[in-house]
Swiss-Prot record:
Residues 353-362 have a biased composition (Basic and acidic residues). The lineage of its organism: Eukaryota, Metazoa, Chordata, Craniata, Vertebrata. GO terms for cellular component: chromosome; nucleus. GO terms for biological process: blastocyst development; meiotic cell cycle; meiotic DNA double-strand break formation; meiotic recombination checkpoint signaling; meiotic sister chromatid cohesion; oogenesis; regulation of homologous chromosome segregation; spermatogenesis. Plays a key role in meiotic progression. Regulates 3 different functions during meiosis: ensures that sufficient numbers of processed DNA double-strand breaks (DSBs) are available for successful homology search by increasing the steady-state numbers of single-stranded DSB ends. Promotes synaptonemal-complex formation independently of its role in homology search. InterPro entries: HORMA_dom, HORMA_dom_sf, HORMA_MeioticProgression. It comes from Sus scrofa (Pig). The keyword Phosphoprotein applies. It is found in: Nucleus; Chromosome. This is HORMA domain-containing protein 1. The keyword Translocase does not apply. PROSITE patterns: HORMA. Keywords: Chromosome, Differentiation, Meiosis, Nucleus, Oogenesis, Phosphoprotein, Spermatogenesis. Residues 306-394 are annotated as: Disordered. A motif (Nuclear localization signal) lies at residues 383-386.
């Protein structure tokens, strides 16, 4: 038991550094927070098969970390995208990463769910913040506080992903990168990305918005937000959010409005009732270990850490992804976290209208139509800003 605990402590230290006193240490933390966040989301949403993940422990929380796997070209492609994000982050160009889920391989602009990761940089470097309503963003935090905030953010992502209704069985991924235009060279593109040609997207169904959290260091700030279909939020209302935190969303998704969206409360608050939810899960599952609900964790499974700037992926692998993105066999009413949902949620492909009729009904009703991820509330007409999209989609 003591050996297992020592092993977990060692693995946790490998994920998040214990000391954040230099810009390089802060950059490492931000990179790893992004990697762990994306890994948690894709794992619990059933995007890739089990073989595409290694295992780590953050204190008592078991997390799955995405890795390259020859049997899962999609995970290799996403790792390649992440390396492109790291390049832009290191140069202090990157402002926001949008990871989007869509169902029609021919129409990546019509999305079903998306996750935003937003970065800010101080004069000394970059920062990732987790700030509660009563906490000042300017308050100094120790390395221990930063690490606690980082782990809390991952816990919140886990709780949210485990309680969202399931995605359709076959989904695809795309990613958009947005920059600080005033410092980013006009011709800059991270490895694996090209200049984007369609900034706006259309959302399937009625969207709901969640501020998940932030994490601070003396050098960077990183925010996590989620937009999903209202129907998938059914379990969230009763299980995680208090009534005062449920807000009526805007019809139009305004993803990034120069930080004004928080003041105008366009998103649901980020104060999840984590302690209550974890206790409920422990009772239901009979688990004696906090933070590991329904996750298969092997003590000896270690993630392969690859920092290679060059990742190869064949054209045939990409074609295979287009035809069949997810190799995971997900049942109609059960998510990877093990939670059972009503068939009306899981059977999304049968219940949702055709793409054209859905778009038509949205336009007629005035509901969610084309929106810009990067529009400013101060501009009457959204300003065209530089952004990138992948050369190859998943």
């Amino acid at each position: 038991m003591a050996t297992a605990q020592l092993q977990r402590t060692s693995m946790s230290a490998l994920v998040f550094p214990n000391k954040i006193s230099t810009e390089q240490q802060s950059l490492v933390l931000v990179k790893r927070l992004l990697a762990v966040s994306v890994s948690c989301i894709t794992y619990l949403r059933g995007i890739f098969p089990e073989c595409a993940y290694g295992t780590r422990y953050l204190d008592d929380l078991c997390v799955k970390i995405l890795r390259e796997d020859k049997n899962c070209p999609g995970s290799t492609q996403l790792v390649k995208w992440m390396l492109g994000c790291y390049d832009a982050l290191q140069k202090k160009y990157l402002r926001m990463v949008v990871l989007a889920v869509y169902t029609n391989p021919e129409d990546p602009q019509t999305i079903s769910e998306c996750y935003q990761f937003k970065f800010k940089y101080t004069s000394n470097g970059p920062i990732m913040d987790f700030i509660s309503k009563n906490q000042s963003s300017e308050s100094s935090m120790s390395s221990a506080d930063t690490k606690k905030a980082s782990i809390l953010l991952i816990r919140k992502i886990y709780i949210l992903m485990q309680n969202l209704g399931p995605l359709p069985n076959d989904v695809c991924l795309t990613m958009k990168l947005f920059y600080y235009d005033e410092v980013t060279p006009p011709d800059y593109q991270p490895p694996g990305f090209k200049d984007g040609d369609c900034e706006g997207v259309i959302f399937e169904g009625e969207p709901m918005y969640l501020n998940v959290g932030e994490v601070p260091t003396p050098f960077h700030t990183f925010k996590v937000k989620v937009t999903t279909e209202k129907e998938r939020m059914e379990n969230i209302y009763s299980g995680i959010l208090s009534p005062k935190q449920i807000k009526t969303p805007l019809q139009k998704i305004l993803m990034d409005k120069d930080d004004l969206e928080d003041e105008q409360e366009h998103y649901i608050n980020d104060d999840f009732d984590i302690e209550t939810k974890m206790e409920e899960q422990k009772k239901k599952l009979g688990s004696s270990e906090l933070g590991e609900p329904n996750l298969v964790c092997e003590e000896d499974e270690i993630m392969r850490s690859k920092e290679s700037p060059e990742l190869s992926i064949s054209h045939s692998q990409v074609e295979q992804l287009v035809s069949k993105t997810s190799e995971l066999d997900v049942s109609e009413s059960k998510t990877r976290s093990g939670k059972i949902f009503q068939n009306k949620m899981a059977n999304g492909n049968q219940q949702i209208k055709s793409k054209e009729s859905r778009k038509r009904s949205q336009l007629e009703s005035g509901k969610t139509v084309l929106h810009h991820f990067d529009s400013s509330s101060q501009d009457s007409v959204p300003k065209r800003r530089k952004f990138s999209e992948p050369k190859e989609h998943i």
